[in-house]
Amino acid sequence: NKMQEEIFEKYPIPKEYFKLALPVVFSMVISLVYNMVDTYFIAGTGNTDLVAGVALGSPIFTLMIALGDIFGLGGSSFISRLFGEKRYEDAKRISVFSFYGAIVSGVAVAAVLMIFRSLVLGLLGASEATWEYASQYYTCIALGAPFIIVALTPSNQLRTEGFATASMVGSVLGAVVNIILDPIMIFVLGWGAAGAATATVIGNVCTDIFFVWFLIKKSKNLSVDPRGFHISRSEIGAVFAIGIPASVTNLMQSIGIALTNRALLGFGDDKVAAMGIVMKINMIAALVLVGFAFGGQPLTGYNYGARNRTRLKATLKFAYLLEGGMALVLMAVLGFFAPQMVKIFMSDPSVVENGALMLRLQLAGMLCMGIVLISTCTFQSAGQAMGAFLLSVSRQGVVFAVVLMIALKVAGYHGVLASQAISDFLTAVLAVVLVWRWWKKVDF
């Protein structure tokens, strides 16, 4: 534990922050690339019904990641505070609970999804034409649920021990396996939608195997050994108090996208298509910001647990400045090249024109989004469940829905486009107020 204490207590903060955050940013960008590669190979079949069928199944994937976050982020937030308090044995038990909790919920999800298959497919909007493909993709992903959900626990927890690079290697390994298997299963074996899903599941299995091996061989304070395992109700509560808000954030994102698409339907399909492209480009920027925000979480949690006010303050100051700087750079670069970015995906002039405007309006809220992300992360690290929950529900949920409704009435089409930026601004104001009030109460 000496090495670990050295890193978290002595290292200069910027160096330590980057050491923890860069691998997170990298893993997130890889997962995005691999989503795009998936889309590329599926589109390569030239079968629109198949492409649509797979797209309809993607919310299921988001749902699984959200569930994985309950144990992944909830467990690791608690573990980093315990490490700061030097309670290594307790941290080990929490890691065991999170690992098996994720397996159990994965099996439960698989069962529920299989039992209610036709009901869920209907809710997702599968039509007669797309049903067969959506169903194939859905079935494989549903059966792979335990493997997909479990992967998120070690990938988050290894960072609390300073193993950010190992966490990245595991995620990248899965993505690479998936990218190699995709064309083989979709085209060579001719499995189509089922092939794409199977490749995803096998990629996750490889990630799981690597993580379990690493935890057994290299990790001192995290474990997958179920022997002598016990956990109290208050400890389960501490994991869920942070894990559930984190998971709600993910679900809100899907809801936000769905609300925007529905609001745009009345303005024509080309607008919906343009927004689909803009969301993908915007996602790159958002993931970089999310990675830098969540990457520093083990450092914030550790210093909070260790009751080290000077170092906690320095960490937060650096986090806000770094995030703000990144947001401004992304706004400038993506905003300047907006039309060219949209053209990569579609060359239709009306889509390019609408898309460029949409992208610039989405980017307008980047700085505020950064403030919200760091604040949410600070609350998660400090075990402040309420603050984390309020912020995660607001930005793409409650505040966004209200802003969208009013903006649509007042300003029509342009109102819809500006909604996210307005919502980001309002949530950022809320974030600053909440963090300020919390910081005045921190008693060390």
Map each language-model feature to its residues.
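Short runs within selected transmembrane alpha-helices of multi-pass transporters and secretion channels
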Residues: 141-159, 167-175, 196-211, 290-293, ...
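Transmembrane helical elements of multi-pass membrane transporters/channels
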Residues: 19-38, 140, 174, 203-207, ...
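Interfacial/gating helices of multi-pass transporter permease domains
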Residues: 42-62, 128-133, 193-194, 235-242, ...
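N-terminal transmembrane alpha-helices
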Residues: 9-40, 44-45, 59-74, 78, ...
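Hydrophobic transmembrane alpha-helices of multi-pass small-molecule transporters
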Residues: 63-66, 178-183, 208-212, 284-287, ...
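Helix-terminus/linker motif at the lipid-water interface of multi-pass membrane proteins
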Residues: 29, 33-52, 121-128, 184-191, ...
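Short alpha-helical transmembrane segments in multi-pass integral membrane proteins
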Residues: 1-21, 79-146, 188-244, 300-365, ...
